């Protein structure tokens, strides 16, 4: 059945139906020590317990409406909006009628966007050459660029030489959420149909196996998996080409990697978790345009990570500060959130924050694999852009510019194929192979290739400091043209050591002025989900968190989650523990899906509009 998409913009259509997977049978044990207790059902999502095997769903109308478009884009971040904008720019230039639909799971554009962010404006200026006249929110050019190594008590300054990737001359400090909101306005003005509050949950396929489009998930489902009286089926969006711009570790991209074997010829992706706060500080300490990065304390040399402090010129003395920890860390006792809070007490950091007020908090995973981890980008009916495949320049600590350029190149490649008079396709869904070729011939590919060895050079005996030495010698001499390519260590989920082989980390208690507890931090993210819905953090096997993760790794999920989603709590009866999932706290960072040593957690989309409500993060 076909209906205008705009008529479906109601809460009943604000989430997506996830792909079904094999039913997992309930295991027999739920305690750390006892094997006599039955496992409580922790997650009830219909991806685990299919509805066609649930009598409560008998007689429920499962018909879905469908809409047709030329191009469907999943995700309204910098990459997705760049692709949408460029498609409509080209359509206007060539007087072509092109329907472009963009869906975004956040309640409004920018609400799930989090980055530092120090923006290299190259791709942005290519897409919007008149951005100044249009009032784009690039208000803070970099005026001072600093880098340092932290010891427990001191900061050792390191000069930033011209030509090194961390040089920020010509860049802008931005609030990326505000920037993508502005980009959304530009896209809509060109005729892009932007639908916030719609979460893509299912990939649709043609009979020949090519991608047909996506479907939004159903709404009106109880926490126990039963339909509510308000149940409404999701919506299908069909397209000639579907662009997946979900951001880092997209849940649909995970399925595409397996379906089309897109990672057959690349290394596993490796990630970091970025935690960020926004402060209003004493105006006397405010240095608009100052950019400050550090490595070192409180992390040891074998744990990749670092920090940033960006002074924003937004009409008030704003400071964006954050901390990144590589998710290939080995100690299961490590808590990225608590390392962040401890870092703020360093003698070179704390004075800037004293007398200030924290006004926002958030977290998001980021790609760190770089050139070696880029998968195949195209497949019949679709392609990957932005942080979904992973185009972040790690030593530069930037990925927005490369994400935007990938979106622009994808749009140009798709437009050429859609408007070709000799259009030929072996599959029903168009296979736009030109996109990958164009990307490899662009400055994006050259930039990522040149820095490919810097992140993996930190795996040696000297750790992060070895990586700095490598950068200072080999990158300075060869400019990325050295005749070798270093490898990563493998998947981040395989890197944890057993708890018995590691030293517990004692973290200081937060003081409530500089450092804070987790729950008060999550409250500043604006995170909210419909409570009575199946948990979107699903478990393949309900026994694994206690029987394996807790017994071997001391329950690392209770530490690597930056939102307090996972807790091991005592059983109501008997000895032992059970895992409690506080799904309503989830900030959609994807860390659990990445770092879980058992790969038992599968993140799927909740009802559309749920999640964090960032304001210019």
Swiss-Prot record:
Residues 109-130, 428-447 dip into the membrane without crossing it. The modification Phosphoserine is found at residue 551. A ubiquinone binds at residues 305-306. Residues 577-606 form the 4Fe-4S ferredoxin-type domain. InterPro entries: 4Fe4S_Fe-S-bd, ETF-QO, ETF-QO/FixC_UQ-bd, ETF-QO/FixX_C, FAD/NAD-bd_sf. The keyword Flavoprotein applies. Keywords: 4Fe-4S, Acetylation, Electron transport, FAD, Flavoprotein, Iron, Iron-sulfur, Membrane, Metal-binding, Mitochondrion, Mitochondrion inner membrane, Oxidoreductase, Phosphoprotein, Transit peptide, Transport, Ubiquinone. Binds 1 [4Fe-4S] cluster. Its main location: mitochondrion. FAD binds at residues 75-80. Accepts electrons from ETF and reduces ubiquinone. Monomer. This is Electron transfer flavoprotein-ubiquinone oxidoreductase, mitochondrial. It comes from Sus scrofa (Pig). The lineage of its organism: Eukaryota, Metazoa, Chordata, Craniata, Vertebrata. The gene is ETFDH.
